Amino acid sequence: MIEINSLKQKVYDVVRAIYDVHGVLGPGLNESCYQEGLQIELKEKKIPYVREMSFHPQYRGIPLEAIFRVDFICKDDIVVECKAISDITGNHRAQLFNYMRLLQKQCGILVNFYPFSAVVERYFFDKETNQIIATDGHVIYDYNRR
């Protein structure tokens, strides 16, 4: 079982950086502007990150030719997926959840910079149970029940 409160603390400074970027740039820009701003903010805050990390998913242990790119991996265990759209949908959440599962990362942040107030959603992946967990502890998605 994962410890939600310690994971919330782990992502806190990344979430703070996200809000700082939105505070400076404001709403309504395109995604790449916010990604560049976040890269600068992470660097200034000395938060370790990799931008646009590419990976090949696997099918039954065999790497596929398909390539996925994650916007940011912070602190080696936090997937950050940036959007600049009118509304976040279930498909955007599914994208983040799959990145977390495929990369075996415990924390995921889905951010929508487009609205007047940035929308930040945090999720956690329990590697033991293969479940996505919300910040309040309830199971959002169970990969064992597909």
Language-model features and meaning:
Residues 1-25:
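Interdomain/boundary linker segments immediately adjacent to catalytic/signaling cores
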Residues 10, 34, 92-95:
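Helical mechanochemical/support elements of P-loop NTPase systems and associated helical scaffolds
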Residues 26, 70-88, 99:
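Conserved catalytic cores of phosphodiester-cleaving nucleases, focusing on short active-site segments
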Residues 27-77, 116-128, 137-144:
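Active-site metal-binding core of divalent-cation-utilizing nuclease and nuclease-like domains
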Residues 83-132:
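Nucleic-acid nuclease catalytic cores
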